[in-house]
């Protein structure tokens, strides 16, 4: 039976017989014996394996096993006299599954993230990307745990849709038509234009109107031709929707949600977060602890504008009531003024989506964004417009044809209730958690303009 390396470091005892399987990170030959550093992906730390000349076929083992090779090692655990770990494995038997030639790209040196993106099929074998994937896994586990503990139902919304939820028009078209001929979408597979989804929100609202509290967690797509460190064409979104909920309840849930995730990852990935704190961003741990222990600030958009207008600095983008907050404004509020996450609410209706509930002043909507230090907006949400006549008017104001979303309007015709929800970009969360500067390095296979090789 194979034992994972993480388990060995947690509960392994001297003289315990184990078998480990993994990949050789380094090989160091001395006169009397050889050291291998082996990693199986379960932990940041490698397990040191000692090969002695008494090992069967020792000379051949030394010739065939190199950095990158896949092996299985059986033997007994022994106390380690060296620094860095308390226990190591004295090999009694070793099996080579797959050798690795000298042109293996991942040798014992630090590689740039730019280079690693060109070998995305191998980069998870590095310390940094392996740690990213473990933190990503912990974040996903925490998300499901949070909502399941609160009685939410996970619903699966469609990947292919005829709707543009965000109204941005940056959509990937799905078609079975011959692209060499003029397109007549009435003859296409669905009889109309179809797209890859940009959000599961509208369909999640449908489910919330029957199941009360639901959430989605799946891939979304934007055909936005942005080559930046903040944009991906394919990314994952978490989108809860709650029936019988208003803007205040939406804020409360979002704050509790973020705190839960950060606390979970702090408890379950301490070595990985310590690695990021030492190698990537020296504020990773303090930022995570700040999220968990701080009561988030709460201000309206109008109050935010007043604070920004009083700021003793010149912003690249001028501030006035009615403009959307830019990243520099969001980070100033979170990093310098509040020094913790802050929730900004009640934005002008002209800069927000049609489905957000119109406030009584007819100027703002019941929207909310959570702004976090270092990254800016991390969650965006709102109370949804539950009044049929107001929703139709808002759609018309934005140049939409209400008939295109007849089924969405039906939710307001048949048993409408106040409801609210929010969206969290999963990769943005992982980027924030790890301190990684480029969002392409927190997803296994980034999809960006001119990049879909893997």
UniProtKB/Swiss-Prot annotation:
Protein EC: 6.1.1.22
Enzyme class: ligase
Primary residence: cytoplasm
Protein's UniProt name: Asparagine--tRNA ligase
Oligomeric and partner information: Homodimer.
Location of this chain's protein in the cell: Cytoplasm
Source organism (scientific name): Microcystis aeruginosa (strain NIES-843 / IAM M-2473)
HAMAP family attached to this UniProt entry: Asn_tRNA_synth
Single GO MF annotation: asparagine-tRNA ligase activity
Any GO BP: asparaginyl-tRNA aminoacylation
The family this protein is said to belong to: Belongs to the class-II aminoacyl-tRNA synthetase family.
Catalytic activity: tRNA(Asn) + L-asparagine + ATP = L-asparaginyl-tRNA(Asn) + AMP + diphosphate + H(+)
Pfam families the UniProt entry points to: tRNA-synt_2, tRNA_anti-codon
Cellular component per GO, a single term: cytoplasm
Keywords: Aminoacyl-tRNA synthetase, ATP-binding, Cytoplasm, Ligase, Nucleotide-binding, Protein biosynthesis
């Amino acid at each position: 039976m194979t034992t994972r390396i993480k388990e060995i470091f947690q509960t392994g005892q001297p003289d315990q017989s184990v078998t480990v399987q993994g990949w050789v990170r380094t090989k160091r030959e001395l006169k009397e014996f050889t050291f291998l550093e082996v990693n199986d992906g379960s932990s940041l730390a490698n397990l040191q394996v000692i090969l002695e000349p008494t090992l069967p076929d020792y000379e051949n083992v030394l010739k065939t096993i190199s950095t990158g090779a896949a092996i299985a090692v059986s033997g007994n655990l022994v106390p380690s006299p060296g620094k860095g770990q308390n226990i190591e494995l004295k090999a009694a038997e070793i099996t080579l599954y797959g050798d690795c030639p000298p042109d293996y790209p991942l040798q014992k040196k630090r590689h740039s993230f730019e280079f690693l993106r060109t070998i995305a099929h191998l980069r998870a074998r590095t310390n940094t990307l392996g740690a990213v994937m473990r933190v990503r896994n912990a974040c996903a586990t925490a998300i499901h745990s949070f909502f399941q503990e609160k009685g939410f139902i996970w619903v699966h919304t469609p990947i292919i849709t005829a709707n543009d939820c965000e109204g941005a028009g940056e959509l990937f078209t799905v078609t079975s038509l011959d692209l060499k001929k003029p397109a007549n979408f009435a003859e296409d597979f669905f009889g109309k234009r179809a797209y890859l989804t940009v959000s599961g929100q509208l369909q999640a609202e449908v489910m919330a109107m029957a199941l009360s509290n639901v959430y989605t967690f799946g891939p979304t797509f934007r055909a936005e031709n942005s080559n930046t460190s903040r944009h991906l064409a394919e990314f994952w979104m978490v989108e809860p929707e709650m029936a019988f909920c208003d803007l205040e309840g939406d804020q409360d849930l979002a704050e509790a949600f973020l705190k839960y995730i950060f606390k979970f990852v702090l408890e379950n990935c301490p070595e990985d977060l310590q690695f990021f704190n030492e190698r990537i961003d020296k504020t990773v741990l303090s930022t995570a602890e700040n999220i968990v222990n701080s009561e988030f600030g709460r201000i309206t958009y109008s109050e935010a504008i007043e604070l920004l207008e009083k700021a003793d600095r010149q912003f690249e983008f001028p501030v006035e009531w009615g403009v959307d907050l830019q990243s520099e404004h969001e980070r100033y509020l979170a990093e310098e003024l509040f020094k913790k996450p802050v929730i900004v609410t009640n934005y002008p209706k002209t800069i927000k989506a049609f489905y957000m509930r119109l406030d009584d002043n007819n100027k703002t909507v019941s929207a909310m964004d959570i702004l976090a230090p270092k990254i800016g907006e991390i969650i965006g949400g709102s109370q949804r417009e539950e009044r049929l006549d107001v929703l139709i008017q808002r759609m018309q104001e934005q140049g939409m044809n209400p008939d295109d979303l007849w089924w969405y309007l039906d939710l307001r015709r048949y048993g409408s209730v106040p409801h609210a929800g929010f969206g969290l970009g999963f990769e943005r969360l992982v980027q924030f958690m790890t301190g990684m500067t480029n969002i392409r390095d927190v997803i296994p296979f980034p999809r960006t303009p001119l990049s879909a090789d893997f």
